[in-house]
Amino acid sequence: MIVVLNDRQFGKNLRFLRRRHHYSRWELANIICSYPKVIRDWETGRSFDVDSVCMLNIGKLFGIPIESLIDDDLRRIYKSRK
């Protein structure tokens, strides 16, 4: 199933988490069964179509609920915890 997102928060969160955990786009794509170009398109807001399996894999990898990936500003949340 494909999930269509309405805004760029998912892409911003994905980029933040990927960089925080020191993954390249290529590495992340291999882990979640996708392609680096797809990761780039999500992060830059060029695409809002996210396969539900990829979404689940991202959530599991980073230990983040899917709802937080979509709705929350994770960068702000992580900064407030410091």
List the predicted regions and their residue ranges:
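Short, basic-rich loop-to-helix N-cap that marks the start of a DNA-contacting helix
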Residues: 46-60
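Recognition helix of helix-turn-helix/homeodomain-like DNA-binding domains
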Residues: 33-49
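A short, Lys/Arg-rich alpha-helix, primarily the initiator
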Residues: 1-20
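Conserved hydrophobic/aromatic packing and binding residues within compact polymer-binding modules
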Residues: 14, 28-29, 39-42, 69
